[in-house]
Amino acid sequence: MSNDFEIQSYPLTVRTNRERVTAFLAANGLRLDALDYYAVVTAVGDDQILAGGGLDKNIIKCIAVSDTFMDEGISATLVSHLMSIAMSRQYEAVKVFTKPSNQKIFESLGFHLLAEAPKAVLLENGLSGWLTYERYLKSLRREGTSGLIVMNANPFTRGHHFLIAQAARQVDTLFIIPVKEDCSKFSYAERKAMLEVGCRDLENVIVCEGSDYSISAATFPTYFLKELDEAATTQMTLDLNLCAKRIAPALGAKIRFVGSEPLDQMTKRYNELMHEILPLEGISVVEMERLSERDRAISASAVRTALAEEKFSEAAAKVYPTTIPYLLAKLASMALQKELDSSPKPGLVDQIDAGAHQDMDYSLMCRSIHALHPHFVALAQLGYQEKLPTSEEMRRLGLEAEREMLLATNNVNTHKGALFAMGLVLIAAAHNYYIYGVIQEQPLRTAICRLASDFPAPKGTHGDAVRRQYNVGGALAQAAAGYPDLFDNWLPYLRQLKGDTFAAHKTLLYIMTKLDDTNVLHRKGAQVASKVKEEARALLSNFSEAELIKLNQQYIKENISPGGSADMLSLTFLLNAILS
């Protein structure tokens, strides 16, 4: 490319840039896909787009060159630029999703073909990538007849286990490849772990590592958008081509199993194409009826809907038993996020401001929740057994969670109080479900009491000093009593506000009227703590958002943060969902 032209980053977050790129791609028979980087080639001193291309992580997409300026030198320079950006992100392999007419250009730059469809090709360049994954798959091969299932398991349901068990009976070895793309409600790590623990009773099942080569942003991006169109059909064809010519042969799999799909049109079309494409490469397709209840297939989407609506019992009825701890952990993280998102709040971090905190903000709190989530799973799994765990077992997991939280927040104590309370409830709830197959209030309260009573009172902490100075119970005493205020007052109060836009805010204020908040006592003393209760009571009796905003501004000036009340609000949200 001559010095008369230049490559420049072209942020698509700028509306005018996005509109120009969309129009440029449309003129070249393409549409704008989801991208996190885009670059354009222009003449020096001119802003007319002559060529452009983008990245979605390590996948080059939306490559186009103006018909009036078909210069392969520009194409090569543009692709080299995009490759360097991808490599700077620590990716060792770069993929490109493009039109077949561009295949030779990319092959001249060291790319090799992975899969093809009539209207698109997928190529790759790099030292690792498919060859590394192929070696891994070949290492898993077993003697005898092998089959394959590609599964999202978002989350792992009784229906998933039913399909796997049915397929496993028909082969000597059954390989499960979980979808790796992390744009599901449950992360890839969680979904893979759910599959592994859920299939332990099936000796001939091997859960493989997922990859970018099965239902991913590279092979099938519209799967995650659920947009059934011509582009989706092209992507399905590419994905199935990869399976037939590369993945299945690497595993030695001769059968691909799939569940029937009566509802989702995207998956239904994918199954139809599977029957057309895979047999051409000697791979049989076995489509099995899904497990149904009341004439409706058990689906992961129904579980996700129930979780979004905070209906644990409805979600739990559909999942495989080993998935229960993951549901409880998800509800715990959702409860923390719901408390954080409730805005405005008096003196507390929310989406608007940091309240009375100088060392915290919204993004830091989000990082803290994200860091705690895997440990919520571990705590729930600890409780999911016949016997309640010991205080030492709980303490060990709690300290691990606290270390991860502090690492994520640069040693800022964002959720230590919430971690203790939620950890106890998660363990108790998981234990109750394991024993009774349901979570009911009284057995849950009893289990919380037993767990908390085993904990020694902490010494040398701010909470310990506050308890001694002001003769208040604190977090451990509340838990050892089974959270009577929460179960008897705060939870019923939240539930009677169902449908109220300000239910969370009013419940927070109601908690503030009752709780001896050790955060407030530590910061400001007993007199201010009493004043906080009175102010919450007054605002609650004559509530308005404007007055809530004023109270927040006042608490920011006075350095008042009712953090203990925020923890109890999160716990109230969690118990409301668990006991739904």
What is each of the regions a protein language model found here?
Residues 98, 102-327:
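Nucleotidyltransferase catalytic core that binds NTPs
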Residues 409-426, 559-573:
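Conserved phosphate/anionic-ligand binding catalytic regions in large, soluble enzymes, centered on
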